[in-house]
Amino acid sequence: MRKVPLSKKQKRAEKIKKTLIHVGIWLLGLLIVIALGVFAVRGFGIKTVIIDQSMNPTLQNEDVVLLNKLSYKIGSPKRMDVVAVRIGASENSPTYVRRIIGLPGETVQIKDGKVYIDDTELELTFDDAAIENAGVAEKGETLGDNEYFVLCDDYNNNRDDSRLDSIGTIDSDQILGKVWLIRSPLSRLGLVH
C-alpha cells in the first residue's frame, strides 16, 4: 500500500496537533505536581508555634513545628508520639503539644515518681527525674476505647496534661496531628522524637 504524501497544510496541522498534545501532557504534569504539593502542605505542613516550656527539652519556647494531620487518618497514635491536641470542644479552644503515654484500654498509674502501664513500669526516655505530682493518675486512670493519656516532657515544672483533672484524658477526636519536625529556628531544625 502506497502512502499519499501530505500537503503543506496537512503537515502544518499535524505539527500543531503534536505540539498541542505535548503542551497538554506538560500542563497535566504541572497540575499533578501542584495537586501533590497542596496535598503535602495540607497534610504534613500545618505549623504551630510552641508558646511555653512544657515540652522542654524536646521542644522549646518559640520553636515552630510542623504537624502531620494524615498519619492518624490511616493509623492510630503510638506511645511516645508527640502530638498537638485541642483541649475543649470549640475551634477556639487552646492547642497543646504533649507526648502520648497511655493508649486506649490501658490503665495508667503514677506512683513513687514512676509511670506504670497496666502495672508495668514505663521507661521515660525524655526525662529520668521522678514525677513529683501524679495528679489523677495517682490511683490509676483506665482509658476508654478512644482515650489517650498525655504528659508534658517537663512534667515537674508543668502540669497541664492528663494528670490535671480539668484536662484529663484526651479523646482521639482532640488529636490534631503528630508533631514531626522542628522547622525553626534553623539551629534546631530536625525531626521530633
Regions found by a protein language model. Give the residues of each.
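Hydrophobic membrane-insertion alpha-helices, especially the h-region
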Residues: H22-R42
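Soluble "head" domains of membrane/secretory-pathway proteins
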Residues: R2-H22, P57, N61-H193
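Aromatic-capped interface at the extracytoplasmic side
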Residues: A35-M55
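Short, functional N-terminal and low-complexity linear motifs
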Residues: I25-I32, T48-D52, T142-E147
